[in-house]
């Protein structure tokens, strides 16, 4: 497969792990690199094959969403770690977005949680979220418990730091009507239901993940970016979960490494005090191999396809 970026595409912008190229007025190309980041810090280590696994996983899920009848911005893969997608306008000024705006990125992230994990567990522990809000009939819940009622949160997408939003503000800044907002929630529920069934075949539990959307030129909802990858979502091993073990099978594995080394505490202390942030150390060679193997293994378990 040849890449438009080799000839006609102009470099547009670079994220922590993804490069974006302008191909035409209506197309952009994503290049998924082998870089890896945690806590908004790019680790100075490359993970072999990581970019390819994420691109192929993202393609897999976008096609699954299309099978359910939903629109996506996906057009085609142009290389092992690249995909061509429809271009939408990115509007940073919320005042310029309204109910009539078309062909734009909805400036929201939707985080769908099926189990108590990550930051949700932290907020429950600190009393910031009442378990009753999640459908629990008790005051205390343990890490790893299945949430009785699917919990979908919304945060900002285009601000320097993602900020949690109540529904009223989410509607205000996104130009969405209440009906469109509810349509997004229903779309997420349907897609996540299929995701859970598919990954269960690979012995996985889909714990949580985020999704992004845009409106096309007819102002019809479509999936933007990728979802369901080992970077975007959290997965646990089903057999081990049934034995009471929540084994991280996604980028969380790398986060846990830096938590154990004490780096996360050091970093967040510096951020709270407004001090210079410490550089994130490189991963040791044995960890790089483990992480690369993890991404390949996750690709095969998520999609049911052989990597090679």
Where would I find each of the regions flagged by the language model?
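A short mid-domain helix/strand-loop element embedded in enzyme catalytic domains
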Residues: 144-178
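A structural signal for short, well-ordered beta-strand segments and their strand-loop junctions
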Residues: 111, 206-210, 223
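C-lobe/activation-segment region of protein kinase-like
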Residues: 242-285, 300
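A short glycine-rich, hydrophobically flanked beta-strand micro-motif that places a catalytic Asp/Glu
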Residues: 76, 199-216
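Active-site loop/lid in soluble adenylation, ligation, and acyl-transfer enzymes
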Residues: 2-156, 272-308
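Catalytic activation segment of kinase domains across protein kinase-like and atypical kinase folds
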Residues: 211-257
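A long amphipathic alpha-helix within ATP-dependent nucleotide-binding catalytic cores
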Residues: 176-207
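Conserved beta-strand/loop block within the catalytic cores
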Residues: 17-21, 210, 218
């Amino acid at each position: 497969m040849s890449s438009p970026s080799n000839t006609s595409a102009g470099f547009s912008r670079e994220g922590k792990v993804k490069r974006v190229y302008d191909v035409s007025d209506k197309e952009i190309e994503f290049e998924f690199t082998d870089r890896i980041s945690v806590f908004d810090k790019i680790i100075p280590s490359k993970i072999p094959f990581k970019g390819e696994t994420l691109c192929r996983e993202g393609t897999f899920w976008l096609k699954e969403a299309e099978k359910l009848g939903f629109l996506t911005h996906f057009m085609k893969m142009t290389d092992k770690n690249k995909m061509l997608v429809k271009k939408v306008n990115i509007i940073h000024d919320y005042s310029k977005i309204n109910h009539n705006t078309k062909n734009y990125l909805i400036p929201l992230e939707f985080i769908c949680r099926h189990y108590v994990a990550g930051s949700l567990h932290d907020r429950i522990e600190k009393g910031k979220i009442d378990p009753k809000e999640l459908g629990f009939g008790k005051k205390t819940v343990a890490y790893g418990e299945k949430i009785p009622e699917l919990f979908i949160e919304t945060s900002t997408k285009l601000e320097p730091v993602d900020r949690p939003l109540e529904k009223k503000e989410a509607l205000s800044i996104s130009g969405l009507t209440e009906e469109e907002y509810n349509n997004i929630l229903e779309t997420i529920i349907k897609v996540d239901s299929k995701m859970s069934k598919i990954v269960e075949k690979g012995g996985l539990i889909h714990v949580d993940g985020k999704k992004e959307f845009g409106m096309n030129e007819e102002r019809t909802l479509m999936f933007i970016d990728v979802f369901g990858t080992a970077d975007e979502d959290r997965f646990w091993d089903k057999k081990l979960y049934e034995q009471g073990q929540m084994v991280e099978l996604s980028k969380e594995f790398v986060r846990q490494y830096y938590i154990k080394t004490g780096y996360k505490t050091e970093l967040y202390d510096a951020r709270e005090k407004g001090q210079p942030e410490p550089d994130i150390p490189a991963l040791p060679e044995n960890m790089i191999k483990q992480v690369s193997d993890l991404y390949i293994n996750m690709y095969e378990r998520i999609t049911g396809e052989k990597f090679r």
